[in-house]
């Protein structure tokens, strides 16, 4: 097993995407997801995933069942008030990225939990972002 990861919306959607035959559509994303010792799903990410899966309710129900099953490696993490505040600070500090609240809370959660491995399709924003007290810690983007 590899170290824990935080799942961002695009990364989680790609990791779960399947072909009509049931094979992974994005094998590298699925491998990153299935090899992680813990998959942290931020609350705002789950809400955004729900929006994108609005035409695939069965897939959303399956994902929610897996996330909330204590026997899986998923951990659902609601944003703390301090995460929201930090997300807004990061959004202001890195204004050129237009992070927004969802990506900002992913970064704030990474900072708070000290889990810097992010499953994401958003290379531009998360690649430029730095976290930590002095904003010097890069995030490790997967895959």
What do these predicted regions represent?
Residues 1-41, 53-65, 136:
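Short, well-structured N-terminal submotif of metal-dependent ribonuclease cores
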Residues 2, 112-143:
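Acidic, PIN/NYN-like endoribonuclease modules and their adjacent C-terminal/linker elements
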Residues 5-8, 41-42, 99-101, 122, ...:
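Histidine- and aromatic-rich ligand-binding microenvironments
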Residues 12-13, 46, 126:
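A generic structural signal for short hydrophobic patches within well-formed alpha-helices
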Residues 37, 73-75, 139:
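Short, conserved active-site loop motifs that form the nucleotide-linked donor/cofactor pocket
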Residues 44-79:
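Active-site-proximal, substrate-binding regions of enzyme catalytic domains
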Residues 75-121:
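Active-site neighborhoods of divalent-metal-dependent phosphate/nucleic-acid chemistry enzymes
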């Amino acid at each position: 097993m590899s170290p824990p990861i935080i799942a961002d919306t695009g990364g989680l959607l790609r990791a779960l995407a399947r072909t009509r035959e049931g094979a992974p559509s994005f094998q590298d994303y699925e491998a990153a997801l299935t090899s992680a010792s813990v998959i942290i799903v931020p609350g705002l990410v789950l809400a955004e995933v729900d929006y994108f899966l609005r035409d695939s309710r069965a897939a959303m129900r399956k994902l929610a069942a897996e996330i909330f099953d204590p026997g899986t490696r998923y951990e659902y993490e609601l944003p703390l008030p301090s995460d929201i505040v930090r997300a807004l600070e990061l959004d202001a500090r890195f204004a050129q990225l237009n992070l927004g609240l969802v990506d900002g809370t992913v970064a704030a959660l990474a900072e708070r939990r000290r889990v810097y491995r992010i499953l994401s399709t958003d290379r531009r924003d998360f690649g430029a972002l730095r976290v930590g007290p002095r904003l010097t810690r890069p995030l490790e983007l997967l895959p």
